[in-house]
Amino acid sequence: MSSRPPYLPPIPTHVPGATAAELAALPEPVILISGISGGGKSVALNALEDAGYFCVDNLPPELLPEFIRLQRAQAVRKVAVAVDVRNAASLPKLLPLVDQLRREGTRILPMFLESRSDTLVRRFSETRRRHPLSSRQDDQGQTRSALIDAIEHERELLASLREVSTVIDTSDLRPAQLRTWVRQLVGAAHSSLTLVFESFAFKHGVPRDADLVFDLRVLPNPHYVRELRPLNGRDAGVIDFMHAQPEAAEMLAQIEGFLLRWLPSYAMDQRSYLTVALGCTGGQHRSVYGAEQLAQRFRERVPTLVRHREIEAREAVL
């Protein structure tokens, strides 16, 4: 049985953007990795190195243009650069330099890795590493309050860079999951715009990387059907249940129509990614179903990725 209900409206077959030939002719974008200390930049950079990228960590921002020109002159196609708060004094120069490089025709994909503060505190405690901005210490190293202060200060310093980047929240990701997610994002980087559908549970908060948020809690909940409770929105039983709900069909059709109407405008805004977050109570049934169904409808029109935050978080602790 088809996973697409017959009563849904047809989908337009074209979203404005570059042609396949034009996209293929573009050079590889330079991947610019930044983010909060402890957020996973090293894991991301290692994943890119394994994927064939020439990677440099902690490059001073003022050296970025000359470094990229040198790599291009040597015909190095895949380049990734990590910058972080260790070069705090030079960070204000970074965004103007990125704008300059783009005007010169260099494609740059900024990726910003972050985590919740409690997760960062735990990671620093486990690794016994000191935060680069932490100054106050007790006899056993940095105090918790000093560490939290340093994390919040770092967020302030990097706020403008986060604003223009594709944000990846690594709070609930294992290193292997982060490596996979980074490779998927980079693999889609030749498109003019990539759609990311992300399911989540409102009780755990709205994803920090969401651009658009839709609330699916008003839809009938499969959780209250005993045999469906242990399943999720990718399972046939839940799919059949949701297909039978007129409200679900109407809501997804309206979200689909909204995205089709505004995708060209988002693409013209020079975004690389648009993250559409769909939430329900537990992040297992309705939101997962909605993310999967919308991804199916857009996959043949624009590059599309799907992630399920709560399912991935549960798998991370198994």
UniProtKB/Swiss-Prot annotation:
Family the entry assigns: Belongs to the RapZ-like family.
An example molecular function term from Gene Ontology annotations: ATP binding
Ranges that cross the membrane: none
Record-linked NCBIfam families: PRK05416.1
Lineage: superkingdom: Bacteria
Role description: Displays ATPase and GTPase activities.
Cleaved signal peptide residues: none
Keyword ATP-binding found: yes
Stretches assigned to coiled coil: none
Binding site for ATP: 35-42
Keyword GTP-binding: yes
Sorted UniProt keywords: ATP-binding, GTP-binding, Nucleotide-binding
SUPFAM superfamilies cross-referenced by the UniProt entry: P-loop containing nucleoside triphosphate hydrolases
Residues binding GTP: 84-87
InterPro entries: P-loop_NTPase, RapZ-like, RapZ-like_N, RapZ_C
Name by which UniProt lists this protein: Nucleotide-binding protein Lcho_3490
Pfam families: PapZ_C (PF22740), RapZ-like_N (PF03668)
